[in-house]
Amino acid sequence: MIELNISTVSIVLCFLLCFCVLLFVCLVIRPLVLSVSVYATLLLLIVILWVIATSPLRCFCIYVVFIYIPLFVIHTHASFLSQQ
């Protein structure tokens, strides 16, 4: 069974909030869509989340759902914009 305490939930929610803000900024500012440093920052955030708050499996699931899939969508959108 998954043990959820207040600190773990708050850290995960804070991480998700930071991620959503970064993703919104990347989508609004067009040059950041192709930025490698944004991807590196997100990887650093997921490693910090893994070390501080969650198990490796939960961290991997969060990575796939909230980072890998949205970044794939951003990459596809940027590729589409560069072909126009």
Swiss-Prot record:
InterPro entries named among the record's database cross-references: Papilloma_E5_alpha
Which superkingdom?
Answer: Viruses
Pfam families in the record, alphabetically?
Papilloma_E5 (PF03025)
Q: Which UniProt keywords apply?
A: Early protein
Q: Which family does the similarity line name?
A: Belongs to the papillomaviridae E5 protein family.
Name of protein:
Probable protein E5
Q: Which organism is this entry from?
A: Human papillomavirus 31
